[in-house]
Each structure stands twice: as C-alpha cells, then as structure tokens.
Amino acid sequence: MSDSEEVMKRFLAGLPPGTAHPEIIGIVVNERGLERALATPGVTTIGYPYSISAYFRRANANMSRGESRALVEELRKATKDSGHGLVVYISMAFGNPYEEPWGAEIVEDTLVWLKDVGLRNVSLADTVGNASAEQVGSLYAAMKDCVEGVELGVHLHSRPEGAAEKVLAAYDAGCRRFDGALTGLGGCPFAGDDLVGNIATETILAALASRGADVGVRLEALAPAIAMTEEIRAKYSHAEKAIQ
C-alpha cells in the first residue's frame, strides 16, 4: 500500500506508554516491497505468499516458479541479516480451482523445500476459500509431522457460515497458530465470491474457546476494535458505491 509507512508511524505513536510492542507482519511480493518493509519502523516480521499454483502466482505477483523460489531465498537471507522474522504462506495449499495439478505431495514437497531453505514458520493458506472443514483437518494432520522443527499454521479464507468449522478442524488436527482479521476484513479478489474473506478474529477466538483453549485474549476487550473496524468498513463501502 502506498501509505503503509504513514499507517505504521501513526500506529506506533498511538501505543500507550509501556505497551509491549506487538508483532507486525509486513506482506511483500517482490524485492521493492521487501526493501520498504525492512525500512519501516515497527515491522517485526516479513510475510510472503508462495503459490503452488502457476496461474495464481502469475496473476498475483507475475512470477515464475523459479523467480518466486529465488525471492524466498533472498527473503530468508535478508531477514536473517536484519533480525526480522519470516513467515511463508503456501497459497492454494488446500486445492486448485484452475485445473492445474494439485495434491498433498505437492504441498509436502514445498514444505520440505522451505525447511531446507531455512524457514521455521510456514502457514497453509486456503487462498480462495474452497476447502471444506474435512479437507482442512486432513491436510493439516498429514503435513504437521513431515517437517520437524517448522511451526505450521493456517491462513484460512471462508464464507462466514463455514468458518468456525474450519478453525476447529485445524485445531483438532493439531494447529496452534491461526491468522484472522477483525470482522473478516479483507480477502482475495480471485475468490470470485464477495462473501469469501479472511476468517474473523472473533470467530476464531470463539471457536477455540469452545474447545477450552486459552488464547490469551478476552473477546469483550476486542469489542471497541471490532466496532471501529465495522465503522471503517461501512465508510469505505459507501464511498466505493458512490464512485460506482
């Protein structure tokens, strides 16, 4: 985003004195993005979406498989030198709607390669929200032990009505790291369904609480942030409609 640096500047300025600095992940898709993220105060971790779909990789980042892998290796070296964390998201991990080859063995091969490069934090991503809860659970269960020493999380997109079931399927399979977004803000333009987006943080927390998990976050404490997010979404939704 063109004003990411200004957003981070205002965010840091607004932190109450004595507040522990949260982890901030800067998502990048090319070298220029990496340079900006590393130079932005407050960014603690670099994130990169590595797609195992050739079509999606071209559409999202205009890269070949070789170019994308070379960038991952560059990210690993740069973050090691700078002291930043690094997480790679395996995009299209749960299936491929573009009639390309897909299978658990492709995901496993990618995980093994990422470990060999030096990655220790990887997330399986359902980029277009086409996985069922059963698929989420079965793939995670199959992948969690194939790369010892790698913390494996999930980054799931979903329609609201199926979101909690997918979270619980991953949790029951052993996942302990989940990505979410307040009110389900954001998503992927390639999903082809306006109702598919990031799973809401509040949905994830409620689902995990139903399993007795101690997530360290009180839902009631999130209420003001959720309300603010809803106001922002409404504001920009109305602005977009006015432009149309």
Regions from the PLM with identified roles:
Residues 1-244:
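Catalytic cores and adjacent flexible loops of soluble metabolic enzymes
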